[in-house]
């Protein structure tokens, strides 16, 4: 999917220690690409720049970066755009989320705020790049996972580990397309090297479309367990959630409501333009240390 010779180098990876960043930098190394990394938790080592995109002295500390892969949420990016352009940015790939549409009507205040930040971040990137002649690509993944590291599928595995079973709100018939962070890292690199992806936004679903229940059963299997799924009436599920909420940091009642919603997207434009070909959903939690 990626052709190193088509990348304009050197590359700057922002959010290098993020979930996607942890997979992107080994890929760039394997391709022999010259790159540097920006992270607020960067080690004191060659090729790393410690800082945030909003730091007032960022420009002075950055190396030349004609290509930028922004691998943290897109709302972090706008404060750093001027500094990145000053260091030669010509090509930008940034990550938003399909949540910008799937959670647009959520009654949850936190989710409403996240949707606003995503939408505002996307608009700021488009507007800046249009004025400054920077080719942009915005990637919108579905449900991101990386065994033992994410806050989506791995949280589900943690709940299964604690309870021994998984309660569903209703039958869990809503569609899901979990996508691995490593596939997203490959997509960012491929899009940066693909002129057809200039000035476009893409949805990036995973390699399989499953019901929520099927996805949960795959998680059980990936843990080496027999699936034990318990469908509950939505009202009863909400009551159980309210009692268990202290044990579920970051979870919201809307997660139960969405178990019956179809959150499926079309990845064919990304496949046609830069070879998007994500893996099927077969997580391997039982291989974790």
What residue spans do the PLM features occupy?
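A short C-terminal helix-loop "cap" of Rossmann-like NAD(P)-dependent dehydrogenase/epimerase domains
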Residues: 157-169
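N-terminal Rossmann NAD(P)H-binding glycine-rich loop of SDR-like oxidoreductase domains
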Residues: 9-31
């Amino acid at each position: 999917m990626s052709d190193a010779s088509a990348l304009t180098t050197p590359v700057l990876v922002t959010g290098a220690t993020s979930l996607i960043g942890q997979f992107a930098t080994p890929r760039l190394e394997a391709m022999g690409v010259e790159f540097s990394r920006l992270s607020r938790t960067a080690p004191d080592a060659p090729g790393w720049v410690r800082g945030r995109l909003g730091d007032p002295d960022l420009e002075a500390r950055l190396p030349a970066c004609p290509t930028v892969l922004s691998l943290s949420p897109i709302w972090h990016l706008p404060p750093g755009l001027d500094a990145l352009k000053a260091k030669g940015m010509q090509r930008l790939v940034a990550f938003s989320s399909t949540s910008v549409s799937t959670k647009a009507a959520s009654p949850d205040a936190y989710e409403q705020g996240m949707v606003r930040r995503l939408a505002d971040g996307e608009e700021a990137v488009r507007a800046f790049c249009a004025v400054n002649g920077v080719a942009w690509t915005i990637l919108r993944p579905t449900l991101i996972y990386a065994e033992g590291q994410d806050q989506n599928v791995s949280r589900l595995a943690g709940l299964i580990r604690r309870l021994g079973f998984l309660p569903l709100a209703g039958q869990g018939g809503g569609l899901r397309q979990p996508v691995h962070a490593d596939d997203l890292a490959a997509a960012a690199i491929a899009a940066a090297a693909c002129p057809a992806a200039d000035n476009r936004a893409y949805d990036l679903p995973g390699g399989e479309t499953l019901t929520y229940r099927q996805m949960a059963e795959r998680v059980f299997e990936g843990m080496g367990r027999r699936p034990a799924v318990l469908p509950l009436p939505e009202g009863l599920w909400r009551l159980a959630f309210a009692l268990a909420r202290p044990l579920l940091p970051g979870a919201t009642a809307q997660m139960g409501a969405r178990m019956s919603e179809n959150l499926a997207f079309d990845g064919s434009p990304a496949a046609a333009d830069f070879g998007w070909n994500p893996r099927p959903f077969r997580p391997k939690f039982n291989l974790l240390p």
